[in-house]
Amino acid sequence: MEGKRLRDSYRQQSYVVRIFHPRGQYPRIKIMQPNALFWADDEVVFSVIHSVPWRVHDEDAPYTEMDWLAPDEIQFLGSIFLSERRNDARIRFYPVYGYGPRIAQKTLDLSKQSVAERIRDSIWIRLAHAPWGNHGKELNECRTHRYSLLDPKLLNLDRQPMYWAGVSTRDYVMLRGISSLFKADMLSSYYEFFEEAIVSAFIALEASFRLIVRKLEGEGIRNAGARDAAQWLFKHFDEPMGLPRPTIERYFEEFYDQRVMTLHPASRFGDNPYAPVSHDDYYHLRSSLREIFAYLAAGSHGPDFHEDVQRLGRR
């Protein structure tokens, strides 16, 4: 798709192709649904999603010059991402930034094997003739570098449809939280940007807190706050594991001071010349928040959570 048709496609619903870079880590799967496709094999990883641009999805959405994933893309890719198991293999989406060609078709059934294979072959040919422009180097690497693919048995992919249904494209806080974890994973690919990965995880932490507060208020708790969110977290995650009630009183209280000092060079904690963070902060937040978002989306824990409860109960 080129010229005016391409420009028009950015202002309406269309089939958006995303190529994923070998810097990421992906499940070796083919998820084919009528309006969404994810394909990962040894040679290429890509998605095709019948997607609506943000400004079409919501004309009141704030202006941004950042070319990032559309709401339908975050919803679909998020449903795969949330399918991770506790303390197991980690998915790391790494889309080629700013590159999202459109398919010149009004309607496609992406659940058909023949359609998916035809798209896959077209992408492979396109990668072979990638221009050396803004994306040429990365697209060439997608063809020449080796992908890191995960055994799908390490994931709860049978829950992917449940997560897809549970993440609404109108739930901007959930979308922001999930996409912030995507960004945190991308940044963590570079040692020098690990601090920024933690900052992105802090954004996801704030999103999870707001989602829990809204859930509690929807259940009748007036003016729910950090203490209520901490009790909710203990009740749904720690107590079933037989863990003692924590001494901290606020939601993820152990990160509160760090977050303030990281985001505010001067605060009531004094002047901070650098962020007081560690690599473990990222790994802890990444694991915990993914599981919290998954629970909020599905309304239940995955089988791996119950396996851990039983295992701890037998000790």
Region locations from a protein language model:
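Charge-enriched, short contiguous segments at helix-coil
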Residues: 139, 245-310
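Generic detector of ordered secondary-structure context
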Residues: 176, 196, 216, 251-254, ...
